[in-house]
Amino acid sequence: MMNMLYRYAIAALAMLLLSACADKVESLGIVPYPENVEIGCGSFDAFGARVIAEGLSAEEEDLVQGLGTLITAGSDGKVRSSKIVFSHIDGMDPEEYAIEIGSRRIEVYSSAYNGTLYAIATLKQLMPVEVYTGVYNPDSDWNIPCAVIKDKPRFAHRGMLLDCSRHFFEIDEVKKILDIMSVYKLNRFHWHLTDDHGWRMEIKKYPLLTEVGGWRNGTMVGWDAKSNDGIRYGGYYTQEQLRDVVAYAAQRGIEIVPEIDLPAHMVSALTAYPHLGCTGGPYSLMTVWDIAKDVLCVGKDSSFEFIEDVLTEVCEVFPYEYIHIGGDECPKIRWEKCPHCQARIKELGLKDSGKWTAEHYLQNYVTARVQKFLASKGRKVIGWDEILEGDLQPGATIMSWRGVQGGIEAANNGFDAIMTPCEYCYLNYCQSDKPELEPVGFHEYVPVEKCYGYEPLDGIPEDAHHHILGVQCNVWTEFIGTPAHVQYMLLPRMLAISEVQWSAPEDKDYDRFRADVMDHQFEILKSMGYTYCKEIEY
């Protein structure tokens, strides 16, 4: 009954707001743009408004109280008669919300924590930037246009990857990324924690992973692969720090997807424990941005014992459904010559198929074995699209990065997929077609408009659309060594990706988006202290 009354009230108010008036604004400036917006006449003065929570959870009440503190902080504690009232409505999706903005009262509806969180994120974008900084300007305009907003995301997975192996970023720097993700309603932080260039997660059973594998003897300079700055480089996160980040992210509606890349991209582990490799070493962490030939020896049972021990600790720290196991860029040259791996191939009866080698099927075996182990822990596997090569077992989720074809193939074969094609979603690529204007990095050109124009369901049959879980942008840090550089590459392109993730195609408009970013969102980014590319077109 309450749900029906809510929908009737929303419809009635929308009709009222649609009445013609001279002062109606064209856009609310919100990114990502909501599913349905009806802008009316007049405005609500939010300065000093009383913020009320009715029937919300304790965690949601904390969110609402936080908004109330921001609104009243600059008003000398004087609370006006105008109200912003938050309440629950049955039947709404967990990430759905609705906002009715009248001249004296705002009603906010949701059914769960994330819906309330996103409603607040939207309201804050309608207010002066003081709500992000806490530094108040008496001349700021706190008037919010009267409107009805009904909103929910298009995709469940709205992700962003940060590579902390190639370059290490301190906890506070990671949290600053989580903060800006929350502003734009991203909800999955893919944390790339291990690679050939450094192991970043404390594993208590294998302390050398961070003591040895967490540090490399220098880093190449620019594009010169023969160069080395000679500076010992590294760092790692303790499990206590990681748990703190998990809690911090959860408050912002973000789940963390940790990645332990295997069986390739493992030189940091091999350097610490050489017996895990096919040759026995010695190994050393890579100092150049390249793909290592050395990978885990999967003919040895000790390698699987290592994998299971590591993933057990990963599951203890990260409580969410998905664990990313990499699976990308795995050269087979060591396996081809390794007696242990060849014995495993013979034991399993693996054969070349003409399309795939026995070593490809050996990697399928690794994926399936790890998948089965994680299933025993109540977890699911995500892997890069290379895990499709050969004979993938049901239940894995594909992350399509080498273009869109991996996601299309996955969906057509009944696998879930997350779309992150490099030509649209790799934000370590240049924002300009003139690399000399950009920091040193990969020369591929991915401007804001290209990010914004990506349609993740193109090429996917309609009856397979449900297999596309969402979209993710990635920042790989081979050439990105500072927090400011990460932010510059991320912003404002992440805002464009956020509309791909959240907004339906019919609700997207690049001209509107560009104006909203230039006129309002840059002000938010600046107020929060982010470095960003100030021109979204060159």
Where are these regions (language model features)?
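Active-site neighborhood of glycoside hydrolase catalytic domains
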Residues: 269-275, 286-394, 401-409
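Acidic, contiguous N-terminal accessory segments
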Residues: 21-156, 375-388, 392, 519-538
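Bacterial Sec-dependent N-terminal signal peptides
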Residues: 1-29
